[in-house]
């Protein structure tokens, strides 16, 4: 029949063709991006671009990469490729090759992350400063966020405290000295029933539970809160400072009760990095997660020599949420996953 066929795409999509963010918010996004680039330009950081599609995924058991398969020149039998979860590894390769201090603004991808403050595809602002440690980089993050948000909202005086101090203040326990059983008892005392099944062998799941439920809700209320010196077992790609207890030289930044940034005094020891990759892979195997090979090109760069530096990844979409008072990520994205 003449005229028969599927309805126009817009009608069949039930209105999902429209952006979920308002035009005012989308214009604000553009303005904030321009301010961020201006902030870096004033400090003479080089903007870089690295591949979104990589031969290596993340070994981190807490993060799953999107995978795809490449067929073509250079891989006659095909090969698995990964959408990056962070530009960290190739940026460190640039640092080892002599780039100097650098930054990047890019889209990254993480499997299974969706919700009020998560989207499988999101924007990171990531930068590395030569000669800096995690305390110096906390100053940088504080300065960038305060300056970029200045036209949208004013913030109170930032607060800084160690991971231990935050736990002692809001949970009433020393997170470094408490056993898993003691942390479980603490969770029960605070009425947390979601810890069932975490077991008594590893303290970190209990620390994460207590942090997310009892500490983070108090952080960043009208001001930036910066936590630093995390348990050594949570070092990820940060250096560990010897002591009693040893601590990871890393920090997280919170605003409006949500994590905004995560930074490290970067590990430069290739042997230690390889050992951490292997620990991650063991945990993935025991948890039944997909196997991921370590990034050999990163390890080669560390062998060549990573300069002393600190790096941080800041969630740009959450920064926009903070600027305009949004409660859900979809309010600051043109097309969240449901509309992609």
List the model feature ranges, each with a label.
Residues 138-148:
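Short amphipathic C-terminal alpha-helix that caps PH/PH-like domains
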Residues 270-340:
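Active-site pocket scaffolds in enzymes
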